[in-house]
Design a protein with these regions (language model features):
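P-loop NTP-binding/switch modules centered on Walker-like glycine-rich loops
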Residues: 112-113, 130-131, 141
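Conserved catalytic segment of ABC-fold P-loop ATPases
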Residues: 129-132, 145-147
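Cysteine-rich micro-motifs
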Residues: 173-186
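Short metal-coordination and nucleic-acid-contact micro-motifs, chiefly zinc-binding Cys/His arrays
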Residues: 155-158, 172-174
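Cys/His-rich microdomains that often coordinate metals
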Residues: 157, 166-169, 181-183
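Flexible, glycine/small-residue-enriched loop-and-beta-strand segment within the central core
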Residues: 3-5, 11, 16-21, 26-127
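The −1 position to Zn-ligating cysteines in a subset of zinc-ribbon hairpins
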Residues: 149, 161, 167, 174-177
Length: 191
């Protein structure tokens, strides 16, 4: 990580002590980065974003406006989090019986280059696979395998995408029309 003069923080945002921010990262209006958070290089944090204690965010990540990344969430490199999408970190929250602290928080992993659309809800304790595409408004209740296309409430796999997010079509043998992938037992494999 680098000195503050190598990244940008808007004057309306607040960075707690003990935060590590990578080079060329930009943190925009009214955002709060809490103690122990680590944000990689070349990452953009939009307006009104909260990054909780001890969250790890990779390089080249884009987190759009109005997103809260709660403790227990880890975001790998090149992930896109759409505006107003929601992470959760407790499986059965109750106001009467507070569940605060790392022993209650479920781990959620967003793998490299996944894209999460606007207004998506990701329940805690899940893994969103590499290059996954989660459609706007989906409610993700199960792990999403690498390259899967997930939409709806509850979220369902409705197809598969390539690294650029283009939907793949398959023949009757499970081979992609582009000839680069094969689908076996709901797992997308490179040929």
């Amino acid at each position: 990580m680098v000195p503050k003069d190598n990244f940008f923080v808007h004057k309306s945002s607040y960075i707690d002590k003990g935060v590590k921010i990578g080079e060329n990262t930009k943190i925009w209006h009214f955002s709060h980065i809490q103690s122990g958070a680590k944000i990689g290089s070349d990452t953009t944090i939009g307006q009104n974003v909260n990054i909780a204690n001890n969250v790890i965010i990779g390089n080249n990540v884009k987190i759009q406006n109005n997103v809260s990344v709660y403790e227990g969430v880890q975001i790998e490199d090149y992930v896109f989090c759409g505006p107003s999408m929601v992470f959760t970190n407790i499986i059965n929250p109750r106001s009467e019986f507070p569940q605060k602290g790392t022993e209650f928080y479920k781990k959620t992993l967003i793998k490299r280059s996944a894209s999460i659309g606007a207004n998506v809800t990701v329940l805690c304790g899940l893994t969103i696979g590499k290059y996954c595409l989660i459609g706007a408004g989906a409610v993700v209740t199960k792990d999403a395998p690498d390259f899967s296309l997930v939409v709806g409430n509850p979220g369902k796999i409705v197809g598969w995408v390539n690294k650029k997010g283009n939907k793949l079509d398959f023949n009757k043998n499970g081979e992609s029309i582009c000839g680069k992938f094969v689908l076996r037992n709901n797992i997308l494999l490179r040929k």
